[in-house]
Structure formats: structure tokens, C-alpha cells
UniProtKB/Swiss-Prot annotation:
This is Endonuclease MutS2. Keywords: ATP-binding, DNA-binding, Endonuclease, Hydrolase, Nuclease, Nucleotide-binding, RNA-binding, rRNA-binding. GO terms for molecular function: ATP binding; ATP hydrolysis activity; ATP-dependent DNA damage sensor activity; endonuclease activity; mismatched DNA binding; ribosomal large subunit binding; rRNA binding. It comes from the Bacteria. Belongs to the DNA mismatch repair MutS family. MutS2 subfamily. Residues 707-782 form the Smr domain.
Length: 782
């Protein structure tokens, strides 16, 4: 896409806002490289990539990327034999630390979601290398500014010797400094350092009283810094130890640099991935500031931007407009008052296209749709080269000529005040001719104009639609609302009347323009009202359709999870059953062995075929395929509404609510209502009522089969549970559902422990996915 277009649309300002949201130079470099793509797959991938991170950013607290920095120059230097210092090694360490923290965050999120919700990020995380050993080595040997003493045994030994020798020197010099006879001879009673040697400040006139080496003097010459002979050898020893320390330090740094060199490829991958993560998070942060949404990209040409607004304008005052090229429309002509928002509309459309094709979420409501353009061309007034001594018309025309030379069917062209700056009749004719030409090219076009001739242009050409910006005659100011499909109308009479012009003059003027034009203006006014109403209805309809689709997708997903969960439970039960049968078979083999021994040794009258038959009866119990009860009954039970039945495929009891034809029935199992085949139902006998004493209860209310404890405090929940179970027993319920939610699991644990001890509870289990999953406990009452 031409840089000239990006400059006109102020895309660099958008990039600067995104750059402000980055943490590292790596992220800022990615922002600077950001440019609109034109390949469909690339654009869609970039948008999905940004949308994934935005979803995560809006739901979770992301780990900090602070300290992330570019390390590729350091890795290169390490690879060619250079030695990295401690600060540079710490930059390497921080990169590894940042990537490990982010990967840990992602793995925790993956564990919570129990599935891969973000495939693009998942792929990036899989590409992150394992650099634990390198991190450990650097972390154990380098602190923020230097090597740790324990970086090696040799270094620790050398530094220990330096410390002990320094202590002896200090003690020696302290004795000299604190000697009463030396107080007047010293400039200050301190020990200081000159040229890496411990010295004392001696007044120049007392030089002869101190045997030693002069290393420095004050600017005035009145103080000499002397190293007494008593510490010269110890200072020499420290110098030698410092040299040894430097050698050992260099050896350790060389060793660590070698580890960096060995992991050079992995470090470059980590740098690339984490730089991209920083870049994507910056996109997500910026998207939040503009309430950006993800558009859907279409192979066919389309533009639908519900309630779009210009992201560089003040969000509190900017007016959002729906911009749409409906059906086969290829050209939209906008008319309306000057400063009414026509140019802003052009720039909004162009900038949103550029943002979307750069992988940025766009400032519209959900549900936007876009096709992908190879180029966006602009001829917008405030960009013209007036300084080149060209007239306004010449400047426009020079730019238009360049556009017409390059545009094709994959282009979007934005014309501002097409044909302006010359004779109105010639300008209007040129404008229509130019529009005819670009229509033949197949480009999509949006143009603004103040020529009334162009209002009629759309009525005798296919694929052309009028639009206008609204003007409020009550306030005598533009509303900046865009009305798609409605041409601009003259407001001269209304404005004149508002300003107090005589009605006689206005009525006389109306007779001069004829009834046809008056009727057209009235028709346009009616269209304005209808357009605004239809626009809002379209947005609301899109929202409802989108919500319905989301609900459908969520239910489909939950149903699939339920099926998977049911399958896993069945397989688990199958495995347990098989293990029990195996155990029983093994035990039977042992019994058979003992029986044979009895027969052989004691002459027991036991026949072999009887033993084999008994063993086969046990073998027949072994279930090799599935535990699910696919029971094929030779004769189906006669089922009626109100019958109590056992659902064979699930092993659960229920009540028939109604029959659906001759083959299906609606069955209530607890809180779940399902349509099931009659062949899957087995009629059960209703339990006989035990004779009980009649207890009269006043104002008794019918209680539900479930108790919702969400929001209760722990003690309150258990008290409520006790009362509910008593009422459920009195109501002869066989099974009830306790809803405690998932949360931290504390309430679930408390409820289940309480049920274990409760006298009225036979047993309990966790809820199936279709019953509420882990957020529900199902209790069977005695």
C-alpha cells in the first residue's frame, strides 16, 4: 500500500499509540514494521492472532514483561568468541525468565480451560525453547551487578583472602590514625584509598615522620597520601589477589558466555516469540482504549461497519456512523453541508481498512464485515501539495491522474470533493466521467461532493448509491450523522425561516423552483427518518443473530463435552468391571485347582465337565466391549404418561411426562428432561407407601428437587441444607440436587462431608455435565 495513503490517513499516529503500549524495544520494532497486508490468509491470521491475545488480556491478569530487551547482538557476540559481562548475562537471564513466566501463565490457563482455546498462541508457546539450565547457571553465579562470591570455589577463596588481608591493613592503619601522637600530623583521622592502595592523609610538613610511599597529594599540596611501609607488602598481596580475581572472573564469564553461545538458536527463537507477544499485547491494550472489535473478512467484496468512528477523534464527542456498501453497490456518493463530516467519513473508512489489514481491532460494533484490498487510494483535500504552486483544482487533478493509472478491481478509492475548484458545470461533468471510469475498472469508490447534479447520478446507473450527512435546522448545525441511501437535500428555506426571513419571500421563492423539486425535498426528508430507523433495526438484528449463534455454539460445545464425559465414565466403569471379573476369574481358577487336587489326591467324585461349566458361567460375565447398557428387549413394555421407568442406557430412574408418537417419550430424570426411544425404557413398579402417621402441617409449601446454596456463607449453607433435606424426606423425594457452584471447592467439600454423616442420605455423587457438572452434588435419600 502506498506510503502517501498511509500518511493521508494518519496511520503513523495509530502506530505511535500502539508503540506507547509496548514494554520493550522488541515490541516497538514490531510496531514500526507493522503495515497493511493484502494476502487474505495473512490478514486473517494477523487478526485472529490479535483477537486471541485481546480475549486473554480482557479476561486475565497477564504476567509482567518488564525487563524484556533485545539480546540478538549479545548472542551474536557470544557466538564469535566475545565475552559477555554480568549486565549482559542478566539481560539474557531476564529474557528466559520472562518467557518462562509467560509459558507458566499459559499452561495454568490451559489447565483451567481444559482445552486449547487459543491455537495461534498455543503454537507460539510450543515454539518457546527450554532454557532452564542456562537460566539456572546465570542465576546462581550472577547477581545484579557482579558475580557472586560462590560463583566458583576459587573465586570464593580469593575474595575471602582479599577480605582478610584488607581487614589486617585496616587494623594496622587504624592504629596509626588513632595514635594520639599522630593526631596533629594528619589532615583527617581516616583511612582512604589512592591508586587501589590503602593510604592515610598526612600534612606535608610531617612527611618525614611517616615512612612509606607517597601515592598522591591534595590540590593545594598541603596533604600527602602516604602508604606506610608496614602495609606495603599487604597491599602488594591484595594487588596480586585482585589480578587472580580478575583472571578467575574472566574464566567464569567465558564459561557462561559459552553456554549462551551453545543456546544461540534457542535464544533467538525466544527473543522473536516474546517480542511478538509484547507487540500483540500492545495491540490488545490499544484495542481496549478504542473498544476495538474483530471484523469478519469475506472473499467477496463487502464493507459493513456498524457504528464506526474515527479512532483519532475525541471518543467522548465523536459521532459513530454505519458505513455499508450493500448488495452490488460499488460507488457511494456523499452529499451534505461543508464541515458536516463528509471528509471524516472518508478518512474513517480508509483508516479502518488499513488498521484491519494490519491486524488491529477496529472501532466499530461487533459484526463488521470487510473484504481485503490490495490498495487504498486517497484524494483528500488537506493532503494536497499547495506549496508546489499548483491551484487547488490542479493539485486534485494531478493526484487523480496517478490514482487512475494504478487502480484496479482490488482497489478502494476515496475522493474528497470530486471535481471541486473549477466551473461548477464542468466540475460536475468531470466528476461523473471520472466515476464512470473507475466503475469500469471495478474499484470500490466513496466520493464526497457538493454538486447537486451528482445526486441524480445514482438513479440512472447501477451499483451507485447516494448518502448524505445530516443537518439540524433547529440548531443550524450539522449532526455529523451519515445517512446511507439518502441523498442530501437543500435546507435553504428551513434555515431562512429559522433566521426570521419573511414567509412571503420564502413562499414566493418556492413557486420559482417548481413543485417537483419541493416534492423531492419532502421525499428525501422522509427517507432520512426511515434510514435512521432501519439502520438501528439492522444493528439490533445483527446483535440478536450474533447472540443466537454464540448461544448455539456454546450449547453445541457443552453437548460435545457431555458426550465425551459420558464416554469416559462408561470406559472407566467398563475397566473397573473388567478388573473385578478378572479378579473373580483368577479366584475361580484357584478354586478349580484346589478341587482338582482334592479329586486327584482324595478321590473326590468331581466331574471335569462340571468344573468347566462353572468356570464358563463366570467367564460369560466378562464384558469386553462397552459398559453402556444397550439392552435389546424382545418385547417392549407398554408405556404411558405418568409411568415410572428405568432408562436402560443411563441406569437412572425417571418419570414419563408425555409420549411422542409410538416410538419416543419425554422423560424427566431429576432436573433433566430428555426425549428417549421407548425401547430404552423399562417400566418399574411404584414403591408401596409405608403406613405412616398422618401429620398435619399448616401453610406447607411445595419444595423443589434442587437447593441452590450459591452465595451462602459456609455455616448458613449447612443449616439451610439440613432444613431442606428434612423437607425433601417429608415430600418422599428419592433424589435431590444440591447446587453449590465450583468456586474454590470449599463449599462443595463441606456439603459432601455433611451428606456423608446425614441420617437421611443413602449415597451421593457429583453431577453429570448435563446436570451442572462439578457445581452440583446429587444426593439419594433413604
Amino acid at each position: 500500500m502506498r506510503q502517501k495513503t498511509l500518511d493521508v490517513l494518519e496511520f503513523e499516529k495509530i502506530k505511535s499509540f500502539v508503540a506507547d503500549e509496548t514494554i520493550s524495544d522488541l515490541g516497538r520494532e514490531k510496531v514500526q514494521e507493522m503495515a497493511p497486508a493484502s494476502n487474505f490468509d495473512t490478514v486473517e491470521f494477523q487478526m485472529n492472532e490479535t483477537d486471541e491475545i485481546s480475549q486473554i488480556y480482557n479476561k486475565h491478569r497477564l504476567p509482567s514483561l518488564s525487563g524484556l530487551a533485545k539480546v540478538s547482538p549479545l548472542v551474536h557476540r557470544a557466538s564469535i568468541g566475545g565475552v559477555l559481562n554480568v549486565g549482559e548475562l542478566n539481560r539474557i537471564k531476564r529474557l528466559v525468565q520472562v518467557q518462562n513466566q509467560f509459558k507458566t501463565f499459559y499452561n495454568q490457563m490451559l489447565e483451567e480451560d481444559e482445552e486449547v482455546k487459543y491455537p495461534i498462541l498455543h503454537d507460539k508457546m510450543n515454539h518457546l525453547p527450554i532454557l532452564t539450565d542456562l537460566f539456572k547457571e546465570i542465576n546462581e553465579k550472577c547477581d545484579a551487578h557482579d558475580l557472586f562470591d560462590h560463583a566458583s570455589y576459587t573465586l570464593q577463596s580469593i575474595r575471602s583472602k582479599i577480605s582478610r588481608t584488607n581487614q589486617r591493613i585496616r587494623q594496622n592503619l587504624d592504629r596509626i590514625v588513632k595514635n594520639q601522637g599522630n593526631q596533629k600530623k594528619l589532615s583527617d583521622a581516616i583511612v582512604t584509598v589512592r591508586n587501589d592502595r590503602n593510604v592515610i592523609p598526612v600534612k606535608a610538613e610531617y612527611r618525614q615522620d611517616f615512612n612509606g610511599i607517597v601515592h598522591d597529594q591534595s590540590a593545594s599540596g598541603q596533604t600527602l597520601y602516604i602508604e606506610p611501609n608496614s602495609v606495603v607488602e599487604m597491599n602488594n598481596q591484595i594487588s596480586r589477589l585482585r589480578n587472580d580475581e580478575a583472571v578467575e572472573r574472566e574464566r567464569i564469564l567465558t564459561e557462561l558466555t559459552g553456554l549462551v553461545s551453545a543456546e544461540s538458536d534457542a535464544l533467538l527463537v525466544a527473543e522473536s516469540v516474546m517480542g511478538q507477544i509484547d507487540f500483540l499485547i500492545a495491540k490488545a491494550r490499544y484495542a481496549r482504549t478504542i473498544k476495538g472489535t474483530k471484523p469478519t473478512f469475506k472473499e467477496e467484496r463487502t464493507i459493513y461497519l456498524p457504528n464506526a468512528f474515527h479512532p483519532l477523534l475525541d471518543k467522548d464527542t465523536v459521532v459513530a456512523n454505519t458505513i455499508e456498501f450493500i448488495d452490488d453497490v460499488e460507488t457511494v456518493i456523499i452529499t451534505g453541508p461543508n464541515t458536516g463530516g463528509k471528509t471524516v467519513t472518508l478518512k474513517t473508512l480508509g483508516l479502518i481498512i488499513v488498521m484491519a489489514q494490519s491486524g488491529l481491532l477496529i472501532p466499530t460494533l461487533d459484526g463488521s464485515q470487510l473484504s481485503i484490498f490490495e490498495n487504498v487510494y486517497c484524494d483528500i483535500g488537506d493532503e494536497q501539495s499547495i506549496e508546489q504552486s499548483l491551484s487547488t483544482f490542479s493539485s486534485h487533478m494531478k493526484n487523480i491522474v496517478e490514482i487512475l493509472q494504478d487502480a484496479d478491481q482490488n482497489s478502494l478509492i476515496l475522493f474528497d470533493e470530486l471535481g471541486a475548484g473549477t466551473d461548477p458545470s464542468e466540475g460536475a461533468a468531470l466528476a461523473m466521467s471520472i466515476l464512470d471510469y473507475v466503475r469500469r475498472l471495478g474499484s470500490l469508490v466513496m466520493a464526497t461532493t457538493h454538486y447537486p447534479e451528482l445526486k441524480a447520478y445514482s438513479y440512472n446507473r447501477e451499483g451507485v448509491m447516494n448518502a448524505s450527512v445530516e443537518f439540524d435546522v433547529d440548531t443550524l448545525s450539522p449532526t455529523y450523522k451519515l445517512l446511507m441511501g439518502v441523498p442530501g437535500r437543500s435546507n435553504a428555506f428551513d434555515i431562512s425561516k429559522k433566521l426570521g426571513l419573511s414567509l412571503n419571500i420564502i413562499n414566493k421563492a418556492k413557486t420559482m423552483i417548481g413543485t417537483d423539486e419541493q416534492e423531492i425535498n419532502a421525499m428525501i426528508e422522509s427517507l432520512e427518518h426511515n434510514s435512521k430507523r432501519v439502520d438501528q433495526q439492522r444493528i439490533e438484528l445483527d446483535r440478536l443473530v450474533r447472540e443466537a449463534q454464540e448461544t448455539h455454539d456454546a450449547l453445541s460445545k457443552q453437548y460435545q463435552q457431555y458426550q465425551n464425559y459420558e464416554k469416559s465414565l462408561m470406559e472407566e466403569a467398563k475397566e473397573k468391571a473388567n478388573q473385578r471379573v478378572k479378579s473373580a476369574t483368577k479366584e475361580a481358577d484357584e478354586i478349580l485347582k484346589e478341587l482338582r487336587n482334592l479329586r486327584d489326591h482324595k478321590g473326590a467324585e468331581v466331574k471335569e465337565h462340571e468344573l468347566i461349566d462353572k468356570k464358563k458361567q463366570l467367564d460369560d460375565q466378562y464384558e469386553a466391549k462397552s459398559i453402556k447398557q444397550h439392552v435389546q428387549k424382545k418385547k417392549y413394555d407398554t408405556i404411558h404418561a405418568g409411568d415410572e421407568v428405568k432408562v436402560l442406557s443411563y441406569g437412572q430412574k425417571g418419570e414419563v411426562l408425555e409420549l411422542v408418537g409410538n416410538e419416543e417419550a419425554v422423560v424427566q430424570m431429576g432436573i433433566i428432561k430428555m426425549k428417549l426411544p421407548i425401547e430404552d425404557l423399562e417400566k418399574t413398579k411404584k414403591k408401596k407407601e409405608k403406613p405412616t402417621k398422618m401429620v398435619t402441617r399448616q401453610n406447607r409449601q411445595t419444595i423443589k428437587t434442587e437447593l441452590d446454596l450459591r452465595g451462602y456463607r459456609y455455616e448458613e449453607a449447612l443449616n439451610e441444607l439440613d432444613q431442606y433435606l428434612d423437607q425433601a424426606v417429608l415430600s418422599n423425594y428419592e433424589q435431590v440436587y444440591i447446587i453449590h457452584g465450583k468456586g474454590t471447592g470449599a463449599l462443595q467439600k463441606g456439603v459432601q462431608q455433611h451428606l456423608k454423616k446425614h441420617k437421611s442420605v443413602r449415597q451421593f455423587r457429583g453431577g453429570m455435565p448435563n446436570e451442572g457438572g462439578f457445581g452440583v452434588t446429587v444426593a439419594e435419600l433413604k
